[in-house]
């Protein structure tokens, strides 16, 4: 294993201070990022200098490997300033488990780099993937695509693409590691929210690409790290759903906190049209509004923080060889997704209340409130956060019925 040395401190407080110092730049660049459909290379450099791409990276490769609860704080802080920048941060922190789960050789390729940007883009790990792989001597031939929603593929050296791998008449969903120089990014990220995340589709430059055998791993093995973990940290034994979705909810929380701060700034001394109130902050309707926003935001934060901490606890248990009961893990996986979706909904509703009471000037392109309003709705639309489906699935478990499964995961 080749360790990569970094001089910067990895403490949570240091990283948060760095994010706060560059946060205003993220907000200033947001309009241009939306027009370009991607954050700028300067923003990627600022994130890298702040250390955010190493918060979920193995210590053995110079990463900070922060606990999930601390990663949640970093992602929340970035989201206060800009949603698209937070999305890039979230993906950059939480997809590293896929690289680790693919085994030591793949992890070595991904993390043994001096790059200060994100390490890995992971996309299309769904049964409906358009990617295909067929077995040949010494490896696989990959074809098909394109792969949509390839967040961070603009900046990573590697992308892990979902494929249906076929061998000896049998098939499975797998992840295959492809270097950036064999891929092209399609200009198809034209969306209503998270516009600057640069989540374009990617496609193979050639019709077919050969990859060595070790770079293709069934997703069932990736999810359980069946290829063996040489890393010491408990993060790599924590439930990946808890890691991914509790921190995802952190984006919604940060967006809501940023809008609340912006609302208070705008409301000070602002008259409410159609009333005798000359200062919105002194008006009783505002006080009721703020109280309602507080309850929604606090509920979201309490659920999300509890799930992040529980993820860390389960990781420590697994690292100490204390087995996690399968039924306990199933309940946790169902609950963390449901509560992440509910937290995202509560935060989107809080932002909606603040937006609706910010006046018509809040719809200006330069106004962070309207941007966060759109970005927060995008989080609620993520395919894994379908609240109605998640309500049903957890309710089935409560009623003693087997939950629905997706790709073998409840």
Would you name each region that the model predicts?
Residues 200-297:
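Glycine-rich beta->alpha junctions and the first turn(s) of the following alpha-helix
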Residues 358-410:
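Glycine-rich phosphate/cofactor-binding loops in nucleotide/flavin-utilizing enzymes
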Residues 41-49, 54-155:
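Glycine-rich flavin
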Residues 149-190, 198-201:
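A short core secondary-structure module
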């Amino acid at each position: 294993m080749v360790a990569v040395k970094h001089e910067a401190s990895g403490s949570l407080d240091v990283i948060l201070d760095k994010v706060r110092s560059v946060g205003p730049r993220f907000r200033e660049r947001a309009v241009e990022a939306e027009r370009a459909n991607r954050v700028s290379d300067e923003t990627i450099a600022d994130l890298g200098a702040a250390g955010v791409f190493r918060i979920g990276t193995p210590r053995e490769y110079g990463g900070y490997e922060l606990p999930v609860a601390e990663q949640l704080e970093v992602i929340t802080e970035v989201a206060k300033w800009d949603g698209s920048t937070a999305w890039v941060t979230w993906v950059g922190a939480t997809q590293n488990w896929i690289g680790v789960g693919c085994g030591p050789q793949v992890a070595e390729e991904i993390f043994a780099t001096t790059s200060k940007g994100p390490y890995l883009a992971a996309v299309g790990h769904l049964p409906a993937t358009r990617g295909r792989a067929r077995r040949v001597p010494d490896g696989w031939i990959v074809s098909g695509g394109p792969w949509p929603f390839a967040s961070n593929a603009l900046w990573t050296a590697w992308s892990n693409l979902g494929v249906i791998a076929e061998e000896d008449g049998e098939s499975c969903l797998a992840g295959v590691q492809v270097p950036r120089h064999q891929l092209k990014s399609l200009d198809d990220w034209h969306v209503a929210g998270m516009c600057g995340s640069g989540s374009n589709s990617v496609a193979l430059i050639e019709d077919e690409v050969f990859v060595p055998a070790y770079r293709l791993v069934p997703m069932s093995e990736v999810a359980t790290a069946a290829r063996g973990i040489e890393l010491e940290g408990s993060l790599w034994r924590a439930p990946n759903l808890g890691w991914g979705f509790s921190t995802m909810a952190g984006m919604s929380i940060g967006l809501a906190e940023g809008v609340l701060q912006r609302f208070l700034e705008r409301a000070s001394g602002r008259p409410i049209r159609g009333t005798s109130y000359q200062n919105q902050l002194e008006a009783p309707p505002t006080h009721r509004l703020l109280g309602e926003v507080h309850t929604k935001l606090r509920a979201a934060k309490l659920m999300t923080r509890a799930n992040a901490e529980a993820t860390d606890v389960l990781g420590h248990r697994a690292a100490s060889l204390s087995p996690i009961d399968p039924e306990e893990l199933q309940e946790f996986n169902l609950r963390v997704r449901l509560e992440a979706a509910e937290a995202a909904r509560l935060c989107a509703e809080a932002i909606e209340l603040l937006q609706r009471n910010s006046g018509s000037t809040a719809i200006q392109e330069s106004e962070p409130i309207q941007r966060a309003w759109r970005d927060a709705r995008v989080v609620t639309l993520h395919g894994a956060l379908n609240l109605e489906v998640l309500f049903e699935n957890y309710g089935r478990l409560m009623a003693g019925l087997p939950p629905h499964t997706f790709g073998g995961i409840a």
